[in-house]
Amino acid sequence: MPLFSILTLFPDAVEPYLGASILGIAREKGLADYRCVDFRDFARDRHRTVDDRPFGGGPGMVLRPEPIAACVEWLEREHGPFRKLALCPAGTPFRQPLAEELSKTERVLLLCGRYEGYDQRLLDELAFETVSLGDYVLSGGELGAMAITEAAVRLIPGVLGDDRSANEDSFHGGGGLDHPHYTRPRVWREREVPRVLFSGNHESIREWRAERAQERTIERRPDLADNDN
């Protein structure tokens, strides 16, 4: 059963999400488990200090390496080696292929940054991969860690009610965007569902969906369309 361990200064912000919706269902089914650890608990001084001023000057504070390293090493003694990812705006963009990899990984550790970021020696010493959700900056990595966990866990067979849901998502297999979806009523505010979708002709429906997905990808994400060629 895959274990996702999230290292954060704000476990109370993360733990409720891990017990809700798809993530909670996966845990109840015994298909995934989570551990949320406050790395401040591994600070050695009486003030439980986890940050300090940056060498070379500049604004903000930098996370010290010692408490985080102690936390990671304790977890690896408890459970064994983890694949370690640090959330960081300067990291590699998170994409669906990585979610697919993580869904098949036995132990994943997600480190949530704060302040100006991490001491680089920590990332180098413990062989962290750095991952970013996008070209913007948040105050911490907690939202990113929760997003990555859900993106991976929902791909584990048996988590979703129908495994085809994950196989037909946008980006599956490194592909393009998903096609438009419709449900009842057939007409809403004079907007009608495309007739092909209730024609009963499954081949025509597949072709229509593939064409609409390609059109949407070219319009909204031409970079993905280029990758498909």
Predicted regions and their residues:
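Structured adenosyl-cofactor binding patch, chiefly the S-adenosyl-L-methionine
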Residues: 118, 122-167, 171
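Hydrophobic/aromatic beta-strand patches that form the interior of the parallel beta-sheet core
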Residues: 5-7, 35-37, 83-85, 108-109, ...
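Long, charged alpha-helical interface segments
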Residues: 172-228
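A short aromatic-anchored loop/beta-hairpin motif
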Residues: 43-46, 51, 55-69
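Glycine-rich, flexible N-terminal cofactor/catalytic loop recognition
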Residues: 2-41
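S-adenosyl-L-methionine/SAH cofactor-binding core of RNA-modifying enzymes
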Residues: 64-114, 120
